[in-house]
Amino acid sequence: MTPGASEAALEALSVRLGLPLAFDDDACSVMVGEQPFAIRRDGPGDRLVVSAIVADDLPDAPSRKLVEDLLNLGFGLMHDGLPAVARDPETGFIAAFAIFAGDRLIAPEFPDAFEKFAAFAQRLTDRLDAERSGYSADSDGGAGEASAADPAGFDIIHV
C-alpha cells in the first residue's frame, strides 16, 4: 500500500459515483439513494472505516433468527473489508461498518467494495424494517435472507 491510498480510494469512489468527495477532518459523508454513509480515515497508516446507520434501534421483539444473524456479523471484524454491526449504547442506533486496509484499499477496487457494502447495508436496513413491522425471518424461513453466494459478495454474511 502506498502513502495516500485512502485519498486515492476516495477519488476512485468519487469518479464511480460521479460526486465530488473529499475528506474533511479525516471524514467524508456520501448519500447513496436514501442511505447516508460515513467514510473516515482511521488509525496509523492508510485505513478507511465505512459505516451506515441501518436502524434507529432494534425491533421491540426481535426474532431469534435476527439476533443470531446480528451476532454472527461480529465475525466480520476478523476479516479485512467484511461488514460488522454494532449498537450505539447512547443513541440505540444500529450501525453497519467495514474496515478497509491493505489490498482492500487499492483505488481501482475500493468502489466495488463500497458498492458491496452499500448493498449489504440496504439489505440489513430492509431486514430490520421487516422485523419492526412484524415480518420475522423465523416465521417463514427468511425475510430478506441472502444465500451464501449473495449478490453483495459477502459470502459469510447471511442477512
What are these regions (language model features)?
Residues 41, 45-56:
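A short acidic-to-branched-hydrophobic micro-motif
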Residues 28, 46-48, 92-94:
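Hydrophobic residues embedded in beta-strands of well-ordered beta-sheets
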